[in-house]
Amino acid sequence: IAIAIGGGYAWVTGKKVAMTDMPQMIAMYNGMGGGAAATIAAVELLKAQGEVASGAPTGDRLNALGLEALNTHPETIAQAMGTDVAILAIIGAIIGTIAFSGSIIAWAKLDGRLNSNKLLPQQQQVNLVLAVLLVIVAVSVFNTDSLMPIVVFFLLALVLGVFITVPVGGADMPVVVSMLNSYSGWAAAGIGFSLNNSMLIIAGSLVGSS
């Protein structure tokens, strides 16, 4: 049902878009892809945090572990998800969230709704500080049993996506859209690994490498 609704809406709206407005539409759909990957990552992280809070596996992990679940008491998100899965989920979340907010800004600039090329003085230095903070918070998410680091993590990633894209001029926007498209693909591939979903891995890798 979801595929039918989404595909039908995209088909109807896509037919109405003029060729001159095609870059805006591509930027918007890039953002949706990144947002979808980030949302899946958020759900998985929140499920893991719920396991930590309850002191026992739930859902799919409970079914997978069976009787072993009785002796399993995860204390961090990394323990609840597994180290490799947690790393991939966090990487996918970062890339997907940046692709989402960055694509929204790209759409706004291409559509003439945003003309600013700088939000703050020393914008590049601010971006660097934000990136460092994001890595630090990502590590804390990996080792946390609390909800707050997850919230801060996604907020920082959203802001970083905006700050990275705003300084880019209109002439370079096609390059940014292409880069964000690649980000969306790699985000989907990362989430595919964390979910053990071959289709997401293949499709995401194809989009990312393109």
What are these regions (language model features)?
Residues 7-26, 103-117, 160-173:
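C-terminal ends of transmembrane helices
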Residues 34-44, 96-102, 106-109, 131-141, ...:
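Helical transmembrane-bundle signal
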Residues 21-33, 118-129, 174-183:
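Cytoplasmic-side transmembrane-helix entry/capping segments in multi-pass membrane proteins
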Residues 26-55, 66-96, 100:
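Hydrophobic alpha-helical hairpins/lids featuring a short glycine-rich hinge
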Residues 1, 80, 84-94, 151-153, ...:
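Loop-to-transmembrane alpha-helix initiation sites
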Residues 12-16, 26-27, 35-46, 165, ...:
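Generic transmembrane alpha-helix signature in multi-pass membrane proteins
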Residues 1, 12-21, 38-61, 75, ...:
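Transmembrane alpha-helix boundary signature
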Residues 2-6, 10, 14, 33-36, ...:
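Alpha-helical transmembrane segments in multi-pass membrane proteins
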